[in-house]
């Protein structure tokens, strides 16, 4: 009986393998994800929205009396960081989007938290507006930058995200020194 079962199994295996090949050959392939139009600009915009959200949340979460905080005398205060980001957003996003930065009332890092946070939010709204027009066909274009130099649009985009990451980590450290959790350390819904 064992011999019959073993012989049947051996005889049946090639047929089983052939059936599997036929089934997999006729089965519909898994649908590939649709290609993203302008993958570089799209990725940049998605990153800009997330990092902007984190930076604005950090500014919202830092108590007003801590906007003058700086870990050492040589460092920027938290208010300096918020103001620097707002000014940088207007210049960098305007440059990337090929638009002049809006003319805004001059602020100081010592202005109130409400004033500084409102300005930061205005500048991220400006970034969202102008970055919506950027596409991958113009990444190689030379743009005017600091000190009369030029950089490609792609390089300015990279510089911008690096600046945001730098100042988000700086803000997160300032928050932790003051016993606060930065936005990215909080559990969702907390």
Question: Where in the sequence are the language-model features?
Answer:
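Bacterial N-terminal signal peptides
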Residues: 4-17
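Short, helix-capping/interhelical loops that line the mouth of catalytic, cofactor-
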Residues: 21-43, 87-149, 178-190
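Short, contiguous alpha-helical
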Residues: 45-49, 53-56, 66-105, 144-190
């Amino acid at each position: 009986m064992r011999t019959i079962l073993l012989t049947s199994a051996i005889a049946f295996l090639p047929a089983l393998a052939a059936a599997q090949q036929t089934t997999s050959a006729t089965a519909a392939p898994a649908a590939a994800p649709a290609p993203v139009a302008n993958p570089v600009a799209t990725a940049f915009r998605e990153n800009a929205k997330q990092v902007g959200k984190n930076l604005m949340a950090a500014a919202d979460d830092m108590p007003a009396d801590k906007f003058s905080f700086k870990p050492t005398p040589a460092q920027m205060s938290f208010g300096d960081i918020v103001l620097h980001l707002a000014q940088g957003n207007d210049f960098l996003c305007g440059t990337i989007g090929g638009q002049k930065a809006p003319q805004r009332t001059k602020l100081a890092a010592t202005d109130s938290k409400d004033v500084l946070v409102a300005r930061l939010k205005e500048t991220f709204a400006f970034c969202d507006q102008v970055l919506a027009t950027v596409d991958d066909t113009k990444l190689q274009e030379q743009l005017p930058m600091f000190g009369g130099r030029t950089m490609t649009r792609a390089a300015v985009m990279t510089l911008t995200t690096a600046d945001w990451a730098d100042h988000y980590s700086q803000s997160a450290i300032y928050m932790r020194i003051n016993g606060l959790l930065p936005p990215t350390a909080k559990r969702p819904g907390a």
